[in-house]
Design a protein with these regions (language model features):
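Short, well-ordered alpha-helices that flank and scaffold nucleotide-derived cofactor binding pockets
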Residues: 47, 51, 127-130
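Charged, glycine-rich active-site and insertion segments that engage polyanionic ligands
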Residues: 1-48, 55, 64-67, 134-137, ...
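Conserved catalytic segments around the Walker B and adjacent sensor/switch elements
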Residues: 55-64, 70-80
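Conserved beta-strand positions
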Residues: 78-79, 111, 160
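ATP/adenylate-binding site constellation spanning eukaryotic-like Ser/Thr protein kinases
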Residues: 73, 122, 144
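Structural recognition of the conserved hydrophobic beta-strand(s) that form the central parallel beta-sheet
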Residues: 110-112, 125, 136-143
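Conserved alpha-helical scaffold flanking the Walker A/P-loop in AAA+ ATPase domains
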Residues: 13-19, 87-108, 116, 120-128
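Residues immediately C-terminal
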Residues: 84, 116-117, 131, 146-147
Length: 305
């Protein structure tokens, strides 16, 4: 049920009111910094739109709710691409829209990272969300509202705020360590790991490889600790070791640009010099482009000084 979701009381009230209005179709933009929380709200609304047991909410235990949770519901479609949903995916959505509902009820289309969509794909999507078919609900997820204006003009906005340290039941120091990422914090709370114990920056490559092989919170924390060790030691690290640090990251990520960008984002949050942050963010944002990743990482690490 909506009441079981921690935080964002206003967002929950908005969705409940939408359900009470008996809307027959719609397009929404859920936006905020916590991607996992955006998806949690999107799936919660999807459950409420398809739940057979509960009115203006979801029970969480019926067959429909359970299949939404496991992403196996016949009328739930999720589209994503780390570099932005492509035109071919939008064409797939168009085909799906042209067919009948599998289960005879509402259909939910969740599109992730819509702020990354290129203009061609966004314009193609626009044709579908202008006048959705009865029973079709589009939920667009985005980190920000840097989205094609015509798409925004045809959507309802819902800001999903990051959960606070108090809501997550941790200290502000712990909250800052994870940059407020709720999913990681909840996983960390189950481990008993001491965040005060450090990890050496020169082991960053091994920590990344371990995480890629087994992506759990224990291995993720080791990456964070290693990055923090590099940051606090940066004034005492020579040029050769700096380049070695960047190369260790490059060879370990195996051209995984999403993880590379996440690592750079974490480092950006450690910087207090706002002039330098601007340059770092510019370099970080180039990672998603088809440019030399190894060179970008070297430039990024060099800019930290």
């Amino acid at each position: 049920m909506f009441k079981d979701i921690i935080s964002n009381e206003e967002a929950k009230s908005f969705l409940i009111n939408e359900l009470k209005s008996r809307r027959e179709q719609g397009t929404y933009i859920f936006y905020g910094e916590d991607r996992e929380l955006l998806m949690e709200f999107a799936l919660a609304y999807a459950k409420a739109l398809t739940c057979k047991n509960t009115e203006n909410d979801f029970c969480g235990v019926c067959d429909s709710c359970l299949r939404i949770n496991s992403l196996t519901h016949g009328d739930l479609e999720i589209y994503e691409d780390s570099n932005g949903i492509k035109i071919d995916q939008v064409r797939e959505i168009a085909y799906r829209v042209s067919t009948a509902s599998y289960e005879g009820g509402n259909r939910i289309f969740i599109l992730k990272d819509v702020e990354k969509m290129k203009k061609e794909a966004a314009n193609a999507l626009l044709k579908m969300i202008e006048e959705p078919e009865k029973g079709d609900f589009f939920i667009l997820l985005a980190n920000n509202l840097n989205i094609l204006p015509t798409i925004k003009s045809r959507s309802m906005f819902l800001k999903i705020k990051m959960r606070s340290a108090e809501e997550l039941g941790i200290s502000q120091k712990e909250y800052n360590f994870f940059l407020g990422k709720g999913k990681e914090i909840l996983e960390y709370k189950e481990t008993g790991i001491d965040l005060n114990l450090g990890e050496p920056y020169n082991e960053i490559g091994n920590f990344i490889k371990n995480y890629l092989a087994e992506p759990n919170i224990e291995n993720k924390i080791k990456i964070y600790k290693s990055l923090r060790d590099f940051f606090t030691s940066r004034q005492y690290i020579n040029e050769i070791d700096k380049l070695s640090f960047a190369e260790n990251i490059y060879f370990a990520v195996e051209n995984d640009r999403v993880l590379s960008q996440e690592i750079c984002s974490y480092m950006c949050h450690l910087i207090k010099n706002f002039d330098r942050i601007e340059n770092l963010i510019a370099v970080k944002n180039m990672i998603k482009m088809p440019v030399n990743l190894k060179l970008l990482l070297k430039v990024f690490i060099n800019e930290i000084y």
